């Protein structure tokens, strides 16, 4: 049997992934039309067309390659995606500046809304780094992250109002059920900033790192 794989050209459009010899893509008319407008691709050849009963094109069988010089385009796009994003989130009675990587699911505020039905997911960054800067220092004794089934490391660095740094680390084997991982500071700290890093241990970048919620106590 012929090797078949379900998917789209999105991965080839996001990362430079050389096409295999004799690789053929089967796509509907809308996807084919978008392909023709995409400057990243060249040498687009229609090998066959499967028509609907009414005669209109249903699926195109297409071979293609990358346009010359496209690797530089991918490199520039990846460099842009690595630029940290900054949002402001209502948290602990104040507006907090949160620096985070590009996300492809959710808004960064979803990680702090107390709703386990929402989540954030990185587009490709592993670890997921969140830097929170408080305009007014807050008193905290722990941070809890709600995680899923990925084997993970969670690392937290806090800076108190005297400029002292404290580091905490925990590991999680993953679980099919959504569950909390708590890092206890062992004391109440008066904090001006928190850096939370969540790493998916069994994946290399690019990877999707999921975070459902962060709770401060």
Region roles according to the model:
Residues 26-29, 141-145:
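Hydrophobic beta-strand segments within beta-rich accessory/binding domains
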Residues 20-23, 140, 191:
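A general structural motif
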Residues 130-139, 184-189:
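Extracellular and analogous surface-interaction loops
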Residues 9-14, 132, 180-183:
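A generic local structural motif
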Residues 126, 148-217:
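Trp- and acidic/polar-enriched beta-sheet ligand-binding modules for extracellular glycan
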Residues 30-39, 68-72, 140, 203-205:
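Short, surface-exposed beta-strand/loop "edge" segments at domain boundaries and coil↔beta transitions
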